[in-house]
Structures are given as structure tokens and as C-alpha cells.
Amino acid sequence: MSERFIVTKEHRRFTEFADSVRRGRTIGLCFGPAGVGKTVSARRYAHWDQAHELLTDWGPRCDDDAKIYAALAKNRTALYTPGVLTTPRLLREDLDRIITRTSICIQQHVEAPDRIPLDRWGTRRTSNYVQLVIVDESERLSPTALELLRDRYDRDQIALILIGMPGLEKSNDQNLWMALGGVT
């Protein structure tokens, strides 16, 4: 992705929308035709271009990673793009991995390393620092996968934004739409 980014009125609108959904811990829906900047705005909001490689290639850390930890801590947001054939099980596993890894990075930024609590086996205990999950290309998800997202929202109280093409708002999942907090 290009280093150059122009902040447009639509990007500012997305940022305000995402901030509102995150603060209110609600479910938001963002849809529109291809090419209007939904994905680019979401990636920018979540600092995903900086963090994606670190979160994907999980392993030893270096001192330069502190900048990425700080960026992730700013909006406490994880971005997920499901594959075309994503099953509910794969969705659950992917979200668990992304949220856990993002939380660990945020924890590294907000807490002193010697202050992170240990469990009884001596490993670090990680709290959930992620406040918002953005799901791009959400029209790819089955009704069962959408129900899994809604269940996760209910249990973990993590705000959720679904991004997709026009028609996403016409989905038949009434339970999901009853929890909806905003549309952009």
C-alpha cells in the first residue's frame, strides 16, 4: 500500500463513525460501492499497514516494535478480512489469534513489562485491550458466521464494524441488526 495518503471528507467521516462505535461499544455497518475508500480508511484507522506484518509473523520482538505497539494502542482496533471460503470455525480461530496478538502488543505499550501479571505457571496473563474489531468484506460471511460475530460482541463487549458492498444492509439476520448502533 502506498505511503501517501490524502485525508478526505469520507475518511474523516469514517474515523468519526469508528470512534463513535468504539466508544459506544455497539455494532456499526459501513457499506458502499467498490473503490470509495472503505478498506483504506479502515486500514488507516486501525494502523494495520504498520501492524499487519508484526501480527502475522508472530515471533521474537525488537526495540523498533515499540512504535507499532503505540500505534495499536491509539485506537485499540483489530482489522480482519475473511477469505472467500471462511467457515465459522476458521473465523473464530482467526479472530481469537488477531485479538490476542493485538492485545499483547497494546499491553506491551501501556504496561511496564515487569508489571504484567503472571499466572500460576509463570506465563504472562493478557487482558483484552482490543475495543473494536473491523471486519472487511463481511458480505463473504455466512449467516452462521455473522451470528458468531454477534455472539462475540455480546459476550466480550467488543465493538464491531462490518464493512461491505451494497446489499449487506439487507441481510436477514434480525438479531444482528437489533444490536446495530450506526450505519455509514
Question: Residue spans of the language-model regions?
Answer:
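Charged, amphipathic alpha-helical linker segments immediately N-terminal to NTP-binding catalytic cores
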Residues: M1-F5
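Pre-Walker A adenine-sensing motif
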Residues: K9-R22
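Walker A/P-loop nucleotide-binding motif
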Residues: R25-A46
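Switch/connector loops and helix/strand junctions flanking conserved nucleotide-binding motifs
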Residues: K38-T39, P88-R89, L168-D173
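Post-Walker A helix-loop "phosphate-sensing" segment adjacent to the P-loop in P-loop NTPases
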Residues: W48-D65
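Mid-core helix/loop region of P-loop NTP-binding domains shared across ATPases and GTPases
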Residues: A71-N75, G83-L148, R152, A159-I161
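Conserved AAA+ ATPase core "coupling" helix
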Residues: L90-E93, Q174-T184
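Sensor-1/coupling segment of RecA-like P-loop NTPase cores
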Residues: L141, R152-W177
